[in-house]
């Protein structure tokens, strides 16, 4: 990877020189929020506003924290579920924002086990049709992950086999495979789609590489599953499944069961 980049760019290391573990960060979350809190262990990362509003309406939710930003604060809630207290929040979209939110929520609440679910684009309709997608690796086509993990093309999704066991025990249809994390859906070009497919990617999304990198860096446990909404086929872009993939409630109740059953000691 490094040889390839250096050859192409004449030795200019650019983004691959961003991983620095030899000096301390100047900006720390304590500067904004004070000391770290320890309120919950598990948290769900919600992308769908429809699902988020359903949760607020149907569960006895309690706000426990707030992530502050100049363009609007994001509340963090808890809900009770089968003798568990589980946090949740509506995340911004995109690798940098979604990953940064996980770090802030950990500081504000103590949650270190994160369940993330949402829609994606299928690169292989035959493989993904009617199945939940459990990513095994994510192509790092974004920027944030290079600050939190050594430069490589792909990052491993370390809890994929634990999730696969959960799905298998419940006889839920699923497929495991590589995915592509991109920063720009408008640059999912024919050549790039073809290249990612040749490498074994079955889906494309916009958060996972960064979220996994920051989770690995800080010692969080991430459980991620996806549902294909659109299909990227050259000359025939299909969008029929987008609404269901984004907003159907089956993913919520599945995520709640995952949160309940993943017995991992939080930090």
Show which residues each predicted segment covers.
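Zn-dependent metallopeptidase/amidohydrolase metal-coordination segment
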Residues: 209-244
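Metabolite-binding pocket within alpha/beta catalytic cores that recognizes anionic/polar moieties
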Residues: 9-157, 161-162, 217
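Generic non-transmembrane alpha-helical segments
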Residues: 162-170, 214, 254-265
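Flexible, glycine/charged-enriched surface loops at secondary-structure junctions
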Residues: 64-68, 172-177, 264-267
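Active-site rim beta-loop-alpha module in soluble metabolic enzymes
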Residues: 153-198
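His/Asp/Glu-rich mid-to-C-terminal helical/loop segments that flank catalytic regions of hydrolases
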Residues: 232-267
């Amino acid at each position: 990877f490094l040889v390839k980049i250096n050859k192409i760019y004449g030795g200019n290391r650019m983004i691959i020189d961003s991983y620095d573990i030899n000096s301390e960060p100047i900006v720390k979350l304590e500067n904004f929020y004070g000391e770290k809190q320890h309120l919950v262990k598990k948290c769900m990362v919600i992308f769908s506003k429809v699902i988020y509003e359903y949760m607020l309406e149907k569960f006895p939710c309690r706000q426990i924290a707030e992530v502050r930003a100049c363009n609007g604060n994001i509340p963090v809630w808890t809900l009770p579920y089968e003798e568990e207290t589980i946090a949740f929040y509506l995340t911004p979209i995109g690798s940098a924002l979604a990953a940064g939110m996980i770090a802030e929520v950990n500081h504000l609440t103590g949650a270190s086990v994160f369940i993330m679910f949402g829609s994606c684009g299928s690169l292989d309709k035959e493989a993904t049709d009617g199945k939940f997608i459990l990513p095994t690796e994510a192509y790092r086509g974004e920027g944030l992950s290079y600050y939190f993990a050594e430069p490589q093309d792909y990052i491993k999704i370390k809890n994929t086999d634990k999730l696969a066991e959960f799905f298998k025990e419940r006889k839920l249809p699923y497929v495991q495979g590589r995915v592509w994390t991109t920063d720009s859906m408008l640059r999912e070009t024919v050549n790039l789609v073809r290249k990612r497919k040749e490498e074994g990617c079955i889906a494309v999304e916009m958060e996972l590489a960064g979220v996994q990198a920051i989770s690995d860096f800080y010692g969080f446990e991430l459980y991620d599953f996806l549902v294909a909404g659109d299909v990227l086929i050259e000359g025939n872009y299909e969008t029929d499944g987008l609404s269901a993939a984004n907003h159907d409630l089956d993913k919520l109740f599945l995520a709640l069961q995952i949160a309940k059953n993943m017995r991992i000691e939080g930090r």
